[in-house]
Amino acid sequence: MSAQIVPAPEHVCYVHCNFCNTIFAVSVPSNSMLNIVTVRCGHCTSLLSVNLRGLVQALPAEDHLQDNLKMHNMSFRENYSEYGSSSRYGRVPMMFSKNDTEHMLHVRPPEKRQRVPSAYNRFIKEEIRRIKANNPDISHREAFSTAAKNWAHFPNIHFGLGSHESSKKLDEAIGAPSPQKVQRLY
């Protein structure tokens, strides 16, 4: 009996995402080992172009490494020249073997910008502080409910006017004569 050696239908490559600093395993079909492929990171969903041509000998032979890695959800596409992607030459593909992953620097992902709180959130925060200052025994839930009712019942608060300022402005608006429409020719 002769044993047939069947070539492995897929190889496992290790790709480093520069955006979220994740290393993930990509299962590459054997017929695509000499192509440029595009993979999508399952963590940050960014697309990475990877040139597999020079990496045929550098691929790890151990199949048990695949079991030890946490697999991220990703998609795999071959990148042919008829797609006309000019971005594939601008990115530097990064593939790592087991030894290379130990020498990587820890790069933190960019931090999200802090958003400015809305007028509603600022009002609720200040109103809860005011309510709790007047009645320290009130629960936070009750103070929030009261603050939300105050926001709903006092529409002048929405524009940043205090209760004393709003009554003065309302009195001025009611007592002032209404503007007359005048047509002018320019």
UniProtKB/Swiss-Prot annotation:
Pfam families: YABBY (PF04690), YABBY_N (PF24868). The keyword Cell cycle does not apply. A zinc finger (C4-type) spans 17-44. GO terms for cellular component: nucleus. Expressed in leaf blades, leaf sheaths and flowers. It is found in: Nucleus. SUPFAM superfamilies: HMG-box (SSF47095). Keywords: Metal-binding, Nucleus, Zinc, Zinc-finger. GO terms for molecular function: zinc ion binding. InterPro entries: HMG_box_dom_sf, YABBY, YABBY_C, YABBY_N. The keyword Transmembrane helix does not apply. One of its GO terms (biological process) is abaxial cell fate specification. Belongs to the YABBY family. This is Protein YABBY 2. It comes from Oryza sativa subsp. japonica. The gene is YAB2.
